[in-house]
Amino acid sequence: MKLSADDKHNVKAIWEHVKGHEEAIGAEALCRMFTSLPTTRTYFPTKDIKEGSSFLHSHGKKVMGALSNAVAHIDDIDGALSKLSDKHAEELMVDPANFPKLAHNILVVLGIHLKPHLTYSVHSSVDKFLATVGYVLASKYR
């Protein structure tokens, strides 16, 4: 999915409000996904995935850090996430069907905490951005 100039502007604008809150947003999005979609827990059988756990916070920070990197390189998301795509496909072997599930929960959390900034057009742009990231991460699966 190609991001328009408006999409890129909208994503960069809302990400200014995400900065400094990546860990909390990521942890909440993961917790919501694991709670509402229990099958997504299978990749973390030995981890404490309860609300507020240190694992959720550290992994949430990683997830949102990768998204922040994609925002910073929004004109070359493929290049920015190439190594992460390799890792997910070859090492972690996460089912790419889970990427849209996490994207949905990230949008939910952004809607809760950044409601005034998540206008209809920004929501649409962030949705397209997250779909693009999911596509890039899944691109190296075979």
Swiss-Prot record:
One of its GO terms (biological process) is hydrogen peroxide catabolic process. GO terms for molecular function: haptoglobin binding; heme binding; iron ion binding; organic acid binding; oxygen binding; oxygen carrier activity; peroxidase activity. GO terms for cellular component: blood microparticle; haptoglobin-hemoglobin complex; hemoglobin complex. The lineage of its organism: Eukaryota, Metazoa, Chordata, Craniata, Vertebrata. This is Hemoglobin subunit alpha-1. CDD domains: Hb-alpha-like. Major hemoglobin is a heterotetramer of two alpha-1 chains and two beta-1 chains. Red blood cells. Involved in oxygen transport from the lung to the various peripheral tissues. Residues 2-142 form the Globin domain. Keywords: Heme, Iron, Metal-binding, Oxygen transport, Transport. The keyword Transport applies. Belongs to the globin family. Heme b binds at H88. InterPro entries: Globin (IPR000971), Globin-like_sf (IPR009050), Globin/Proto (IPR012292), Hemoglobin_a-typ (IPR002338), Hemoglobin_oxygen_transport (IPR050056), Hemoglobin_pi (IPR002339). O2 binds at H59. It comes from the Eukaryota.
